[in-house]
Swiss-Prot record:
Species name: Mycoplasma mobile (strain ATCC 43663 / 163K / NCTC 11711) (Mesomycoplasma mobile)
UniProt key word Protein biosynthesis: yes
Source organism superkingdom: Bacteria
Name listed for the protein in its UniProt record: Arginine--tRNA ligase
Short sequence motif named 'HIGH' region, residue ranges: 119-129
Length: 536
């Protein structure tokens, strides 16, 4: 937690100032050897020409422990200074937590553009999209919680060949509803229930207006527009049910007029064989990339580059772009990052999180996802099978780059083998305790430290919360949050099982601990967008 580090840094800097020493102080987590540790004495060895242990002793003697809420300081070989915070600091910390002030304070905040899900508007969202939605939305929540500005964006791929396939599939299914049995879908079309659903929506809206109408270019374009509109409405509806909403939906078609202007901003393009190329091999790519083919058409790379240029240069003043790619697109990452450098952006402008496959199992059977064959497990199906809470939790409970097997039968069970339930159960238990207590929380009356091993373990887990949030805001590893909440819930349950709280001599202190735990569990569940039930 930044404020904890700041406190110890100030204590060290104050001591160094008294010794007329000017040096940058770096702290590390001490884990089992205190709250924080510093190697400043070893850093100063050469400058002062003294033994690090002697230097450490000089520094420690100048530290005002009471002022900086330090309980004790230990010096260990070869010269580390380990700091243990006073119990007054923990009372202060827990009181802040209990009032929903989690002391999140990054040294610097940024504006992020997160583009996630971005499924083609050609069918229902499936479980793979659900993983991207849960991870992207949770990361956006955490970044915002850490005081960053976040733009949530969905890129609507409405300009490719897949939209032509969608339009014709919609046309055929619509004609079949009207009784035309002579028309059949091509093998490479979309054969799923989603197209039948879209056709019913289309038929409800237009009745027999297009009955037996030839599939002309004009009709094709109409079915393209309507197909995308219907699919996108369904996508938005399912995402809302999944507690995911976006700030922007950007059409790929809207980017096309901006491609030529955007490509002119690239530094290292050249023409060869009638095509326009981007020189990427000089920056580590295995080959240069074609932007405009010799027939004048764009490669898929060109609109993608233009779109990223637009995102970076719009009025939001975005510092960083975060994309979510399927594992099958991992080779695309490097060339995108190289290309963005050619626009003059910094190397770390684009961050890409890889989303591995999700497999769903029920009764020992694996479902194979293929939208065109109609065997995909949709987001709607997933929610119906295990509920929004379980889906949101288990889709973010592992690293995004690891393959994920979801056992529906196990996840749906409400017991202590279910991580989401463990957290919700602990939260409900905190509510039960706080409903029973009659004490008025006045932290000034707390005199004794948290010295019981179950109390101290819970305090140590709680204090990690803001540190964890700050860490996730930097490394984007959101699975650490769900794992942390499980650890917190288990620590609380151990504390509860081994402590008399209500009517105990130390009830005031323990109620503060319960209240802080309740607040952290609630905030963690809110970030995951998993419900926090008052009772179970």
């Amino acid at each position: 937690m930044y404020i904890m580090k700041l406190l110890i840094k100030e204590a060290l800097e104050d001591a160094l100032l008294k010794l007329n020493i000017s040096r940058k102080v770096i702290l590390t987590d001490a884990k089992d050897f205190g709250d924080f540790s510093s190697n400043i004495a070893m850093v100063l060895q050469k400058d002062l020409g003294k033994n690090p242990l002697e230097i450490a002793q000089m520094i420690v003697e100048k530290i005002n422990k009471e002022k900086f809420l330090i309980e004790k300081i230990e010096i260990v070989k070869p010269g580390f200074i380990n700091f243990f915070l006073d119990h007054k600091f923990y009372v202060y910390l827990l009181e802040k937590f209990s009032k929903n002030d989690f002391l999140i304070e990054l040294e610097k905040t940024y504006t992020y553009n997160l583009e996630y899900v971005s499924a083609n508007p050609t069918g229902f969202l499936h479980i793979g999209h659900a993983r991207g939605a849960a991870i992207g939305d949770t990361l956006a929540n955490i970044l915002e919680f850490a005081n960053n500005k976040v733009i949530r964006e969905y890129y609507v791929n409405d300009a490719g060949n897949q939209i032509s396939i969608l339009a014709y599939a919609l046309y055929i299914r619509y004609q079949q509803i009207l009784g035309n049995k002579t028309l059949n879908l091509p093998e490479d079309s979309y054969h799923g229930e989603d197209i039948k659903y879209f056709a019913k929506i289309f038929h409800k809206k237009y009745q027999e207006k297009f009955k037996n109408v030839d599939y002309s270019l004009e009709v094709e374009n109409f079915f393209k527009d309507e197909g995308v509109k219907i699919a996108l409405e369904k996508i938005k509806l399912d995402l809302k049910t999944f507690r995911v909403e976006f700030d922007l939906y950007t059409s790929e078609k809207s980017i096309y007029p901006l491609i030529e202007k955007s490509l002119k901003k690239l530094k290292n393009t050249y023409e060869q064989d009638g095509a326009l190329w981007l020189k990427t091999t000089d920056y580590g790519d295995d080959k240069d990339r074609v932007l405009i083919k010799n027939d004048g058409t764009y490669t898929y790379f060109a609109p993608d580059l233009a779109y990223h240029y637009v995102k970076k240069t719009r009025s939001e003043n975005v510092d960083y772009l975060i994309d979510f790619f399927g594992a099958d697109h991992i080779g695309y990452v490097k060339r995108m990052q190289i290309a963005l450098e050619q626009f003059g952006f910094s190397k770390d402008t684009l961050n890409v999180l890889i989303l591995e496959m999700v497999k769903l199992r029920k009764n020992g059977t694996e479902f194979v996802m293929s939208k065109r064959k109609g065997t995909a497990i949709s987001l709607e199906d997933l929610i119906e099978l295990i509920g929004v809470d379980n889906a949101r939790f288990f889709l973010v409970d592992h690293s995004s780059s690891s393959k994920l097997d979801l056992e529906i039968d196990l996840i749906a069970e409400k017991n202590l083998s279910n991580g989401a339930f463990i957290i919700q159960y602990a939260y409900a238990r905190t509510n039960s305790i706080l409903e029973k207590t009659k004490v008025t929380l006045d932290v000034k009356l707390i005199r004794k430290p948290f010295d019981d091993k179950f109390e101290m373990k819970l305090v140590n887990v709680l204090k990690e919360f803001p540190i964890l949030i700050e860490k996730i805001a930097e490394n984007f590893k959101i699975h650490l949050l769900s794992q942390y909440l499980i650890t917190l819930a288990k620590s609380f349950n151990s504390f509860y099982s081994n402590s008399k709280i209500i009517d105990s001599e130390e009830e005031l202190k323990l109620i503060l601990l319960v209240k802080a735990t309740q607040a952290v569990l609630k905030k963690g569940l809110d970030l995951l967008k998993v419900e926090a039930p008052e009772r179970i």
